[in-house]
Amino acid sequence: MTKEQQLAERIIAAVGGMDNIDSVMNCMTRVRIKVLDENKVDDQELRHIDGVMGVIHDERIQVVVGPGTVNKVANHMAELSGVKLGDPIPHHHNDSEKMDYKSYAADKAKANKEAHKAKQKNGKLNKVLKSIANIFIPLIPAFIGAGLIGGIAAVLSNLMVAGYISGAWITQLITVFNVIKDGMLAYLAIFTGINAAKEFGATPGLGGVIGGTTLLTGIAGKNILMNVFTGEPLQPGQGGIIGVIFAVWILSIVEKRLHKIVPNAIDIIVTPTIALLIVGLLTIFIFMPLAGFVSDSLVSVVNGIISIGGVFSGFIIGASFLPLVMLGLHHIFTPIHIEMINQSGATYLLPIAAMAGAGQVGAALALWVRCKRNTTLRNTLKGALPVGFLGIGEPLIYGVTLPLGRPFLTACIGGGIGGAVIGGIGHIGAKAIGPSGVSLLPLISDNMYLGYIAGLLAAYAGGFVCTYLFGTTKAMRQTDLLGD
């Protein structure tokens, strides 16, 4: 049995056994477990399992085990359950243990009602953030892969211009790499439309068509469509993904209404046709111009804050981004990043935000040095630090800095210092989203690699010094405990 399989089985035992698990799924770093009875979960045992870097209680119990490991752990849990990831796990009861389904249903409804009430205050915001995450998180591997391939093409192109390399085959290779990159970035509106349709309950194919509509692929030469508000020609992609998401949301409403009123015999023909016609026209003549104005204004405001605020803005963004990640609010910036890339070829917000993770790495290094007697902490750091350098910060957040308290605050200060350096230098952008930390380096635009490295080093140093001096307690240094 592999260590990942052992980890999976220990997690199952800690959450009350397979009989207490309703379903299992995973993201990039966390196994997400929906349990039937929270009272059967042994939280302390779960947190102290070797390999578990943190535990978050939400709608699902989220067990942080790190990238790579998470897929193997989740897949083994799915194998043991006999169902696919995300599917409900059937629970069989023998005759001597007959289940009172009526009572069970009533208890389940009561629990769901209480959970719903507990989330009423932030319900709408949580729903928006969850929708944004569900639309874009599946695209992150494509962003990373396409972005890195585009970064390699840019490096090769620069080397050719400088005269270090030459040859027709190099030119062809650069062309091929750029074609692969554009396979994602040029058709992002279509991918966004498909995922938005899944999120809002529309037909994914129709969502892709609406996304593709914004590209105006049928417009050429004199067949120009005009912006009904300004009288200027509409531009392909105007309104960006903000317009696509809103249009697909309207599509979901229209399609659902049509399904209710169109006879079943002709539903497959009439509903998609009318839905595309209505929403397509609205998208071209209403949503694209309005969303274009919104996205242009949003990007202008963000760029203005970064360029005018400089060091101050950089510090505030870098210092506050880690708490936003902790709360899951960082997903709200994904559409902004993408719009900045669409309009100017780079997002100048991402390199500053990436300093938050670098500050946390510096804090973790200080903990490694200061807390030599704390073997539990050092064992956790062994798994969380390497991926932290690569920009995956959740294992450090939930497994180290947040449970300890003080190091989380000093890590934020380190992130602010790195952000101040990036903001002070200025014009340091990223050509794609997805990675951060060292992994973001190949995606830095306009050859501003040294500026980004300077920011990373400043964040590492700031997080290290602040944590070394102020971020530990006697208990952290002399006991073998992690958090409370």
Swiss-Prot record:
Compartmental location: Cell membrane
Q: In which pathway does it act?
A: Cell wall biogenesis; peptidoglycan recycling
Report the residue ranges that make up the PTS EIIC type-1 domain in this protein.
130-484
Q: Which residues form the active site?
A: C27 (phosphocysteine intermediate)
Domain of life of the organism in this record? Bacteria
Fill in the domain comment. The EIIB domain is phosphorylated by phospho-EIIA on a cysteinyl or histidyl residue, depending on the transported sugar. Then, it transfers the phosphoryl group to the sugar substrate concomitantly with the sugar uptake processed by the EIIC domain. The EIIC domain forms the PTS system translocation channel and contains the specific substrate-binding site.
Q: What is this protein called?
A: PTS system MurNAc-GlcNAc-specific EIIBC component
Q: Which organism is it from?
A: Staphylococcus aureus (strain USA300)
